[in-house]
Amino acid sequence: MYLNKKTYVKQWDHQSPEEKYEVVVTKGGKPVDAIKASRVKYIEEEVGYWRKANQIHRWFVDNVQDGVDNCGDYYVNKSDLETLLDVCKKVKADHSQAEELLPSASGFFFGNTDYDEWYYNDIDNTISILEDALEDENGEYYYTSSW
């Protein structure tokens, strides 16, 4: 499961030099001719990764994907990131709220559903991912899962 950041970098004639991104693609220190920098529209970065964090996946399915669990790419707005961060911080501060605020989910690919050390490690990881993402004012965020 991934949180990706897409930044629009397409250059237009009407942009000032300060607004333009410079895209350079090299391999082994040499320019890659097969990728034309002028045609690059987006840079996509993996800013978060979860492995078997079923509670986090369930939150995205319920709150971002309208209950549809289909391994698609889903836009995540800033307020959704802030909400998930708030929920994670509440669960971290008071473990007794975990089952109510961020319930685990069962499934073939998810591992255990216990509220144990692994569950709370996922909470810490998520807090770190979201705090970093929310510090950055550029780009759009997308959640995707794959099995």
Walk through the language-model features, giving the residues of each.
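Acidic (Asp/Glu-rich) sequence patches and key acidic residues
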Residues: M1-W147
